[in-house]
Amino acid sequence: MKRDLLLTKIEEYKNIMPWYVLDYYQSKLSVPYSFTTLYEYLKEYKRFFEWLIDSDLSKAARIADVDLTTLEHLSKKDMEAFILYLRERPSLNTYSTKKGVSQTTINRTLSALSSLYKYLTEEVENEHGEPYFYRNVMKKVATKKKRETLAARAENIKQKLFLGDETMAFLDYVDKEYEYKLSNRAKASFRKNKERDLAIIALLLASGIRLSEAVNLDLKDVNLNMMLVEVTRKGGKRDSVNVAAFAKPHLEAYLSVRKDRYQAEKQDVAFFLTAYRGLPNRIDASSIEKMVGKYSESFKIRVTPHKLRHTLATRLYDTTKSQVLVSHQLGHASTQVTDLYTHIVNDEQKNALDKL
C-alpha cells in the first residue's frame, strides 16, 4: 500500500477509536512501530470493538465510546468466545469456502490485543503514575502455534531462496536478461528504474536488512567506503550493518543517476526514491514488494523481500557456521531465531542416511 494511502486509512481508523487506543497509537509511534504494523493493529481493534458491541459486552453505541472498564472486566471466557467467533464466522471473501479466518489471522488478532492490554496494564501512566488498570486477561489466553518442525519449515523456505550461485545469477538476470521479455513500452519503464531496483535487490541480498529498514534509509545512513548502512531496528535501536562487497557497484550505479533521474534536491534525504507526478518521494514498502515479486517470478519463483533476508542469513551461516555472527548481522538479540538456517544448510543428516 502506498504511504499516502496508508496514512489516510490510519487516520480513518483513528477517528473512530476510543481515546486510550489513540494514546496507545501515539506511544507505539514513538518506539517506533511501523505505520504498516499500526495500521494492521487498528484494523484488529475495530473488529474486536465491533464484536464487543454486537455481543452486548459493551453498552456503547459506537466504538469510540467503549470504555476502559469493559476491557478491564472481560473474562477469559469472553476472550475465548471472541476467538470462537473468529474461527466460526462466515468468511468475508465471497469466493472462499472457508468458514472462518485462518489461524494465522487469529494469532495476529491476539498479538494486537496482547500489545494493547500490556500497554494499558503495564506501560502507560495515569496522573498518579499508575497504569489504567492491572488485570490483563490476555495473559490467560492461549495461542495455537502452527505445527511444523524446524526441518519442515526449512525445507519449505529453501525452495524460495537464491542460494549459492543463484544470488549473483538473479542480479545478472535483472541486469542483462529481464528486459528482453518486455514490450517496448514496458522496457522504457524498466530502464527508468533499473539502477534503483538493482541497488535495492543487491542491498537486501548483501546485508539481510528488513524491508522497512531499507525503505527508511537516508543518504547519510549509507557509507560505501566502509560498506556499512545505519538502520533503525525493531524497538527503535540504531544499528550498523555490514554490506557484502558485491552490492557496491549496484549502489554506486544508482547514486550516479539518483539526482537527475528522480529530480532529487538537497531536501530529498531518502536514499531510495521514486518519482510521483514528477516529484521525488521515498519509495514505499509495497512498491519494493511488487518489484521483488515481479523480478523473482520471472527469474525462478515469486518471493518476498523477507526471503532475500533469509537468503543472506543462510549463505552467511553456510560460510561461517556461526549462529552468533548471523544473529548479529540480522539484528537479533539471541541465536534462537537463527536455528532455522542451521536446518536449511544441514546436509550432514542426509549424508549419513546415504551411507546406510
Curated annotation (Swiss-Prot):
SUPFAM superfamilies: DNA breaking-rejoining enzymes (SSF56349). FtsK is required for recombination. It holds the Pfam family Phage_int_SAM_1. GO terms for cellular component: cytoplasm. GO terms for biological process: cell division; chromosome segregation; DNA recombination. Keywords: Cell cycle, Cell division, Chromosome partition, Cytoplasm, DNA integration, DNA recombination, DNA-binding. Residues 169-354 form the Tyr recombinase domain. It is found in: Cytoplasm. One of its GO terms (molecular function) is tyrosine-based site-specific recombinase activity. The active site is at R210, K234, H306, R309, H332, Y341. Residues 16-121 form the Core-binding (CB) domain. InterPro entries: CB, DNA_brk_join_enz, Integrase-like_cat_sf, Integrase_catalytic, Integrase_recombinase_N, Integrase_SAM-like_N, Recomb_XerS, Tyrosine_recombinase_XerCD. It comes from the Bacteria. PANTHER family: PHAGE INTEGRASE-RELATED (PTHR30349), TYROSINE RECOMBINASE XERC (PTHR30349:SF77). Belongs to the 'phage' integrase family. XerS subfamily. This is Tyrosine recombinase XerS. It comes from Streptococcus equi subsp. zooepidemicus (strain MGCS10565). The gene is xerS.
